[in-house]
Amino acid sequence: MRPSNRTPAQTRPITITRQFTAHAEGSVLVEFGETKVLCTASFTEGVPRFLKGQGQGWVTAEYGMLPRSTHSRMDREAARGKQSGRTQEIQRLIGRALRACVDMKALGENTIVIDCDVIQADGGTRTASITGACVALVDALNWARGKGIIKSNPLKFLIAAVSVGIYNGEAISDLEYVEDSAAETDMNVVMTETGKIIEIQGTAEGEPFTHEELIELLGLAKNSIREIVDVQKAALN
């Protein structure tokens, strides 16, 4: 039995609120249960130096957690003077995932910076960030098309992400913190709206997992991501 009484395949209630802030070209509040992340997409003309003159754009991401997004206050990383390895890993994951769904040639020499700020954390912050950031990205691209900055839509497909794992010997989807912290296996999966895999991060935290369990976890992730994409589409429509 899961602490929330959810079934093994059941995700938490997922909400996506668009245009959550006034200034960003795309902004979304994404909620996976008690995990809440503000995702903004900022569109700027021009690209990093290594891409200049190549006729293509760039998408990158930054990630952070507010000091009291967790049960006890943590210092701001800016106050410590450096980002943690975890933060760097997560923002690279978000950037890689989003670049997979954008046609960089169609974007032209423009840059989109995604900022994912965790307001409240209860497990799955990186997967919630990717899911919300994709919707914010769509809004930023639509803004640029409306302004005539880009002519065609660079979006190739929607992407979403979910955590899956083995908890008390059972494969489950969308882990909350109490499950994540005690899971025997923890995995983050990013997929396209058609179920193609973009990234898998999987670790045996306690017991090694079998090939059969891996296939079961990926099946859970695929079904959950299909449901999450439906939430994205409903928000965009």
Curated annotation (Swiss-Prot):
GO terms for biological process: rRNA catabolic process; rRNA processing; tRNA processing. Its EC number is 2.7.7.56. PROSITE patterns: RIBONUCLEASE_PH. Keywords: Nucleotidyltransferase, RNA-binding, rRNA processing, Transferase, tRNA processing, tRNA-binding. The keyword Endoplasmic reticulum does not apply. Pfam families: RNase_PH, RNase_PH_C. Phosphate binds at residues 86, 124-126. It comes from the Bacteria. It catalyses: tRNA(n+1) + phosphate = tRNA(n) + a ribonucleoside 5'-diphosphate. It is an enzyme of class 2 (transferase). Gene3D superfamilies: GHMP Kinase, N-terminal domain (3.30.230.70). GO terms for molecular function: 3'-5'-RNA exonuclease activity; RNA binding; tRNA binding; tRNA nucleotidyltransferase activity. InterPro entries: ExoRNase_PH_dom1 (IPR001247), ExoRNase_PH_dom2 (IPR015847), ExoRNase_PH_dom2_sf (IPR036345), PNPase/RNase_PH_dom_sf (IPR027408), Ribosomal_Su5_D2-typ_SF (IPR020568), RNase_PH (IPR050080), RNase_PH_bac-type (IPR002381), RNase_PH_CS (IPR018336). Homohexameric ring arranged as a trimer of dimers. Phosphorolytic 3'-5' exoribonuclease that plays an important role in tRNA 3'-end maturation. Removes nucleotide residues following the 3'-CCA terminus of tRNAs; can also add nucleotides to the ends of RNA molecules by using nucleoside diphosphates as substrates, but this may not be physiologically important. Probably plays a role in initiation of 16S rRNA degradation (leading to ribosome degradation) during starvation. Belongs to the RNase PH family. This is Ribonuclease PH.
